[in-house]
Amino acid sequence: MSLRQHQHPLIQRLADRIEAIWQAFFPLAPYALPEDLGYVEGKLEGERLTIENHCYQAPPFRKLHLELARVGESLDILHCVMFPEPRYDLPMFGCDLVGGRGQISAAIVDLSPVTGQLPAAYTCALNALPKLTFRQPRELPPWGHIFSPFCIFIRPQGEAEEQQFLDRIGEYLTLHCQLSQQAVPTDHPQAVIAGQRQYCQQQQQNDKTRRVLEKAFGVPWAERYMTTVLFDVPPV
């Protein structure tokens, strides 16, 4: 049984939605993670910590990563990032849900540019979406300059806002899958590689994620997981 069956209902629904959209657009092939990092169990302050990774590849993406994690009965996490092949100047799709004790405390989604600004087709499509208002927006972390103006970071209030957020992720993801299939190779792959490296290096600064992993598995393991599973930088 997948870990998601035990997680917050919104995380279950989002995981299913992401995989359904991927399957609708791409011929998914497995992406090989280190054998010991695909499914991981540990202890965090006496509670069981479980991490389950789902990883695929499909042109023009070198890696499609969906991570589910659970700490005891108190914390549920969904983390998703799509890593384009560096020869395409495509944004980084990323979303995260963090919940515990029946509530979602943090929800974020973005299409983050890697070469300064989003491609014009993305800006046009995202501007065409109906504007949404959420009652509790959250402040981006200090390294949040990597995100686009279309980033949504909130604490959803009630089921209606949870559904709105889920649907908006579906819209962002569908747009991304559609537009990515029209991408042509860039003349400046080194700029894309540099942008993806910057994105990954900034995300690796996420202290909350790092602290949880270090407490459960130790500093060397956490560093390896952060840099090989969560945010591996593309080769030069």
Swiss-Prot record:
The record's PANTHER family line, in alphabetical order, gives: PHYTOCHROMOBILIN:FERREDOXIN OXIDOREDUCTASE, CHLOROPLASTIC (PTHR34557:SF1)
Entry's Gene Ontology BP terms = phytochromobilin biosynthetic process
Q: Which reaction does it catalyse?
A: (2R,3Z)-phycocyanobilin + 4 oxidized [2Fe-2S]-[ferredoxin] = biliverdin IXalpha + 4 reduced [2Fe-2S]-[ferredoxin] + 4 H(+)
Keywords, sorted A to Z: Oxidoreductase
Instruction: Write the protein's name.
Output: Phycocyanobilin:ferredoxin oxidoreductase
NCBIfam families reported in the protein's UniProt record = PRK02816.1 (NF002760)
Keyword Nucleus among UniProt keywords: no
Q: What's a Pfam family in this record? A: Fe_bilin_red
Domain of life of the source: Bacteria
Asked whether the UniProt record includes GTP-binding among its keywords, one would answer no
Q: What is the lineage of its organism?
A: Bacteria, Bacillati, Cyanobacteriota, Cyanophyceae, Acaryochloridales
Species of provenance:
Thermosynechococcus vestitus (strain NIES-2133 / IAM M-273 / BP-1)
Q: What does this protein do?
A: Catalyzes the four-electron reduction of biliverdin IX-alpha (2-electron reduction at both the A and D rings); the reaction proceeds via an isolatable 2-electron intermediate, 181,182-dihydrobiliverdin.
- Kindly list the GO molecular function terms attached to this UniProt entry: cobalt ion binding; phycocyanobilin:ferredoxin oxidoreductase activity
The catalytic activity of this protein is classed by the Enzyme Commission as 1.3.7.5
Q: Which family is annotated?
A: Belongs to the HY2 family.
